[in-house]
Design a protein with these regions (language model features):
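Structural alpha/beta core scaffold segments of enzyme domains
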Residues: 1-202
Length: 202
């Protein structure tokens, strides 16, 4: 459309490009500029980003500010999780980029724990940086890092052993399939056994 050419007349030849890890899922403005230049000059145009240009143009991930609160009983049973998140979406929209960041963060927040209630406030902010998009598990590590740090903090405040606190709240095998407050479904898993084994080997 940008070039005034019918889509059926455009041929894309894609050779082996190696692993993508998400950053190659995006149509970047530079692609359009190269196509426009080729059309204007009437000859093939090739653009290969230098390493420093790659960091200035290719989508990235994980520029997120998270604040959370974990509510639990005196016995250490999780009651609720509240999270306020501000996500840097970059300077422009990259297709599914912002959606992927916010969706993955949302779905991963309960982790593998029984959390009856969850409140989440998400704010996406456009800035002057490179765009956020699918890149090496975008949104997932941010959510789990926050959750696990909250659990460690709760263990310190309550005096309950940090592994024991997790074992009390992890989704048991007999509860499978388990649907989280955010709609994610765990169909199977033996998380308590894995934690017990980790403790034994530590």
């Amino acid at each position: 459309i940008s070039l005034g050419i019918e889509p059926a007349r455009i041929r894309v030849i894609s050779r082996d490009v190696g692993g993508g890890f998400g950053s190659r899922n995006v149509i970047y403005p530079e692609y359009v500029a190269v196509l426009w230049a080729a059309r204007k000059l009437g000859r093939p145009v090739k653009w290969t980003a230098r390493r420093d240009e790659e960091f200035q143009t290719t989508s990235q991930a994980r520029d997120t500010l998270l604040r959370g609160q974990l509510g639990l009983t005196r016995d250490g049973d999780f009651l609720a999780l509240r999270v306020d998140s501000t996500c840097n979406l970059g300077a422009y929209h990259t297709g599914n980029g912002p959606f992927t960041q916010l969706r993955n963060l949302t779905r991963m927040l309960p982790g593998v724990y029984k959390t009856p209630a969850l409140y989440l406030e998400l704010i996406g902010v456009f800035t002057h940086t490179v765009p956020i998009s699918s890149y090496r598990g975008v949104g997932r590590m941010e959510a789990i890092t926050l959750l696990e740090r909250l659990i460690d903090k709760a263990a310190a405040v309550t005096g309950i052993d940090r592994i024991e606190l997790r074992l009390r709240n992890v989704i048991p095998p007999e509860a499978m399939p388990h649907t989280t407050p955010m709609g994610g479904v765990y169909d199977s898993g033996t998380y308590s056994a894995n934690m017990a084994l980790t403790r034994e080997k530590a």
